[in-house]
Design a protein with these regions (language model features):
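PAPS-dependent sulfation machinery
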Residues: 95-188
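Short catalytic-loop micro-motif centered on adjacent basic/acidic residues
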Residues: 187-191, 313-315
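Hydrophobic anchor at the beta1->P-loop junction of P-loop NTPases
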Residues: 68
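P-loop (Walker A) phosphate-binding loop of NTP-binding proteins
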Residues: 71
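Pre-Walker A (Motif I) flank of P-loop NTPase domains
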Residues: 62-65
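A conserved segment at the C-terminal end of the G1
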Residues: 77-90
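PAPS-dependent sulfotransferases, especially Golgi type II membrane carbohydrate sulfotransferases
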Residues: 1-59, 226, 233-371
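Conserved phosphate-donor/acceptor-positioning beta-strand/loop module used by diverse small-molecule
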Residues: 191-193, 202-227, 330
């Protein structure tokens, strides 16, 4: 069998997999929805957990937390997965989905229950295998609860260094400490695509934060994004659970409920929406959106020296093609121990490859639009 035949077979197999009806485990769905509806009581439980752990938390230090961000499908998840295997790193996991606010008490309870222990391909059907111990992006639960504009694409979502919210900051830092304590780790790691407009704010309130901004070739990136959006739209039609759960945990990048990130460019967002009305997969719309986000990031890095010095821009293609070199740069930038990451580095140097289960299907006109 030739490599082309093999690739075609993989593509066909992946296409057939897309016909299945994805479902989160029912206990996770119902618990997540229940706790979302009683959020006031959940916040009281959070305060109780904090009080319970207060003597221990005084000994926990937030040291150079690592923030992975960039547009969805850029390679942020595989970067999260890789770094989460560092023995010093603590992060949110699938096990935290129902009760993200209680990283210690909920984890202590959930680990005793035999739910979601089997490994399976995640909802995105992109070859990433997960179970309850796998890293997951859950921070948006807090941001969207506290700040009303973060999921409102008609308003600027930029949080710069001028914003003050002492109450949220106390909660946020305490939560990080509780998560690190619960996992016996020293370095906090998080992935949140929506944090791309908050890097200036995060840098101001956590001065030693480290940022990894993942960038991908726009042709492949948009092909992956459009494919994913089609998939989510298809799955959401007959799966209310998927739609509800992704809204609760703040995963709104794809499908009928996707929310654009507004970088103080409402007219541009409106234009994108007009294009999507005619065609939800309009290449021009996605290209404009991609450019607006990374142009904003470029401007921040050029005008904010403090943020720039704390940021490493990682090209996804370089990460796949020159894995060892780029992994070393990531570890150097984050300040994680290279020695304690050697085995993981070897594994991911072999594992990191550009996706083969699909290929961009753009015509010449589409490619020119993207360029």
């Amino acid at each position: 069998m030739t490599s082309d035949d093999s690739s075609q077979k993989q593509t066909q197999e992946h296409s057939h997999k897309q016909d299945f009806q994805y479902s989160y485990p029912l206990p996770i769905y119902y618990l997540t929805r229940f706790f979302d509806k009683i959020n006031g009581l959940v916040k009281l439980a959070d305060k109780f957990e904090t009080l319970l752990l207060r003597p221990k938390l005084s000994e926990v230090r937030i040291d150079r937390p690592i923030y992975i961000t960039g547009l969805a499908r850029a390679g942020t998840t595989i970067t999260l997965e890789m770094l989460s295997n560092h023995p010093d790193v603590g992060n949110h996991k699938y096990i935290h989905i129902p009760m993200t606010y209680l990283p210690f008490l909920w984890q202590s309870f959930a680990l005793k229950v035999n739910v979601f222990t089997e490994r399976a391909e995640r909802i995105h059907q992109d070859g990433i295998i997960v179970n309850r111990d796998s890293p997951e992006a859950l921070e948006e639960v807090f941001w969207q609860r506290r700040f009303s504009n973060v999921m409102d694409e008609s308003k600027s979502n930029i949080m710069d260094g001028l914003i003050d919210d002492d109450e949220f900051l106390r909660f946020y830092k305490t939560h990080i400490k509780k998560l690190l304590f619960a996992q016996h780790k020293t370095r906090y790691l998080t992935k949140n695509n929506y944090n791309v407009t908050r890097i200036e704010y995060i840098k101001r309130v956590i001065p030693d934060a480290r940022f990894l901004i993942i960038v991908r070739n726009p042709i492949n990136h948009l092909a992956s994004t459009i494919k994913q959006s089609k998939l989510f739209k298809k799955m959401s039609k007959n799966n209310e659970r998927l739609e509800v759960l992704t809204q609760i945990i703040g995963h709104r990048e794809f499908g009928p409920n996707r929310v654009c990130i507004n970088v103080d460019n409402t007219p541009t967002i409106n234009y994108i929406r007009e294009l999507w009305k005619n065609d939800p997969n309009d290449v021009e719309a996605w290209a404009i959106y991609w450019n607006s986000i990374y142009e904003y990031v470029k401007n921040v890095l050029e005008t904010n020296e403090k943020v720039a010095s704390s940021t490493l821009v990682v090209n996804y293609e370089d990460l796949c093609d020159n894995s060892e070199e780029i992994i070393d740069k990531i570890i150097d930038h984050t300040g994680l121990s290279k020695r304690r990451f050697r085995k993981v580095k070897k594994i991911y140097a072999k594992k990191l490859r550009k996706p083969k289960y699909y290929k961009p299907e753009f015509g010449d006109e589409d490619i020119q639009t993207i360029k």
